[in-house]
């Protein structure tokens, strides 16, 4: 019984080994060493005879022995269909992975260190061109800044500086001050006094208007449509006019007299 069990297990092991390749299995079945598999020695001899051809036909690799090795770099195989994987080369000739990136950096450094003066203009030029190329079709691609206005050229340099430093609303004051400086100190004193009187007059007028508003009485809502309704529409039209208004006692007396007169009749 033990021999039969060992022969059966050996036959199963041999069958599993021979399933890997049809050519190897056919050669082993035709050989004389594999004709009699009843004994353990014949079984081991058959396995030893078939093992070299089996390893030659289907080489065993570490890890997944049943799979063939990848013919290409895994990263290139997976990412080669993306346009940014080629690093600017045509037909995928650039090396993928870290080597391609390092090669590209070396090329950029070599171009930067080439002959010719290096300055800020040389560095910022390509970047600005690249940005305008990529963002020119968007309306927000260009940065929003102040509108460019035509530069006014003045014959005098001082006028040009004052026009650029101060807005339009201060130009009159600047011209007035220049005229006063040209006249002399007496003219400056007179103009200062005139300004003080003008300011004092404006303040006095504002205070007078405020006092008149306070003395005029309670606040009236004349700017609202319900502030002052017409007299004929007050109280729901009960009081139509001032002439028809009579004391309430007189109305009651007249009503009593009319009722008594009707009862007497």
UniProtKB/Swiss-Prot annotation:
Phenylalanine amide carried by residues: 87
Leader sequence residues: 1-26
Cysteine disulfide links: 28-50, 34-46
Tissue expression summary: ACTH and MSH are produced by the pituitary gland.
Residue list for modification Valine amide: 144
GO biological process: calcium-mediated signaling; cell-cell signaling; cellular pigmentation; generation of precursor metabolites and energy; glucose homeostasis; negative regulation of tumor necrosis factor production; neuropeptide signaling pathway; positive regulation of adenylate cyclase-activating G protein-coupled receptor signaling pathway
Keyword Nucleus: no
Subcellular location: Secreted
Similarity field: Belongs to the POMC family.
Protein name per its UniProtKB record: Pro-opiomelanocortin
Naturally occurring in which organism (per UniProt): Bos taurus
Source lineage: Eukaryota, Metazoa, Chordata, Craniata, Vertebrata
């Amino acid at each position: 019984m033990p021999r039969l069990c060992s022969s059966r297990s050996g036959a199963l092991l041999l069958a599993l080994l021979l399933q890997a390749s049809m050519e190897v299995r056919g050669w082993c079945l035709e050989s004389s060493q594999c004709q009699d598999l009843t004994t353990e020695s014949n079984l081991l001899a058959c396995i030893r005879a078939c093992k070299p051809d089996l390893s030659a036909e289907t080489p065993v690799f570490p890890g997944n022995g049943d799979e063939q090795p990848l013919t290409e770099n895994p990263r290139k195989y997976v990412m080669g269909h993306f346009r940014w994987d080629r690093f600017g080369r045509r037909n995928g000739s650039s090396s993928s992975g870290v080597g391609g990136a390092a090669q590209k950096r070396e090329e950029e450094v070599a171009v930067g260190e080439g002959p010719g003066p290096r300055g800020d203009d040389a560095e910022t030029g390509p970047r600005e061109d690249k940005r305008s190329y990529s963002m020119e079709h968007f309306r927000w691609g260009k940065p929003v800044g102040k509108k460019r206005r035509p530069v006014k050229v003045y014959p005098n340099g001082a006028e040009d500086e004052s026009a650029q430093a101060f807005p339009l609303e201060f130009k009159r004051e600047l011209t007035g001050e220049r005229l006063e400086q040209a006249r002399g100190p007496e003219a400056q004193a007179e103009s200062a006094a005139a300004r003080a009187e003008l300011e004092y007059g404006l303040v006095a007028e504002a205070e007078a208007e405020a006092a008149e508003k306070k003395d005029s009485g309670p606040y009236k809502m004349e700017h609202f449509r319900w502030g002052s309704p017409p007299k004929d529409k007050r109280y729901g039209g009960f009081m139509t006019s001032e002439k028809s208004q009579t004391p309430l006692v007189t109305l009651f007396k007249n009503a009593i007299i009319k009722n008594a007169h009707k009862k007497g009749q």
